[in-house]
């Protein structure tokens, strides 16, 4: 049996990544047009979570997780790759629709004076805050996509009979979700809503396979 060529793998599956063009245009259009969100997302739990600038590093590691999981599943397990794209892109699309219908934002970001510290992590945080307005936050796309990546990878052929890899995927995704609230990029409500968008796919895509993968 011949090993599938790069061209044969590119043709049926990689075109899913064209969605990113649509997503980025749509996302930044919303970011530029929604300046005064109608709904402010807040929970009393948010007030109990301290700001910690060092969580900006797991927050930014989302890009590494996205690239790594997408590439590995595309190359080694196209069935899981297709499921990842279905879960993640449909969820991201729903999030953008919600932002349009229910424009929402946050008011929990601390000022530089309130932080009272000057270090690399704070500097990175301030750069992100300048570029990323505190609007379009619920559900959290950061958390929704992280959950999809952990789920798809942990149920893939790559993680089958490799509990350590499953643990790494879930711990990494968990740290990313935690980072969103410790950096005040999101409310805990955003996180919960984002993860709900992941959970709804489990019975449809993994109801039977979960037993096999374990």
Task: Name what the model sees in each region.
Residues 1-66, 116-118:
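N-terminal transmembrane-helix/juxtamembrane module of multi-pass inner/ER membrane proteins
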Residues 21, 58-65, 141-145, 192-196:
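Membrane-embedded alpha-helical segments of multi-pass membrane proteins
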Residues 24-29, 92-101, 171-181:
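Aromatic-anchored segments of alpha-helical transmembrane domains
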Residues 31-44, 74-164, 212:
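Membrane-interface loops
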Residues 56-72, 89, 93, 145:
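Hydrophobic alpha-helical transmembrane segments
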Residues 65-70, 146-152, 171-179:
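Hydrophobic, membrane-inserted alpha-helices
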Residues 113, 133-138, 175-202:
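Interfacial helix-loop-helix junctions of multi-pass membrane proteins
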Residues 204-214:
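Membrane-interface capping segments at transmembrane-helix boundaries
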């Amino acid at each position: 049996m011949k090993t599938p060529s790069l061209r044969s793998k590119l043709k049926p599956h990689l075109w899913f990544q064209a969605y990113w063009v649509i997503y980025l245009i749509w996302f930044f259009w919303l970011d530029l047009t929604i300046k005064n969100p109608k709904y402010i997302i807040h929970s009393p739990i948010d007030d109990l979570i301290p700001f910690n600038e060092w969580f900006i590093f797991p927050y930014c590691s989302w890009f590494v997780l996205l690239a790594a999981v997408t590439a590995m599943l595309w190359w080694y397990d196209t069935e899981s790759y297709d499921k990842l794209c279905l879960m993640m892109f449909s969820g991201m699309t729903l999030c953008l629709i919600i932002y349009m219908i229910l424009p929402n934002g946050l008011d929990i970001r601390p000022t530089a004076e309130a932080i009272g510290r000057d270090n690399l992590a704070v500097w990175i945080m301030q750069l992100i805050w300048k570029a990323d307005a505190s609007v379009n936050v619920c559900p959290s796309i950061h958390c929704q996509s992280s959950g999809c990546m952990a789920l798809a990878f942990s149920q893939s052929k790559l993680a089958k009979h490799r509990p350590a890899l499953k643990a790494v995927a879930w711990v990494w995704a968990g740290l990313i979700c935690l980072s969103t609230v410790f950096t005040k990029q999101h409310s805990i409500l955003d996180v919960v809503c984002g993860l709900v968008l992941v959970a709804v796919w489990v019975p449809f895509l993994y109801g039977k396979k979960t037993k096999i993968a374990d």
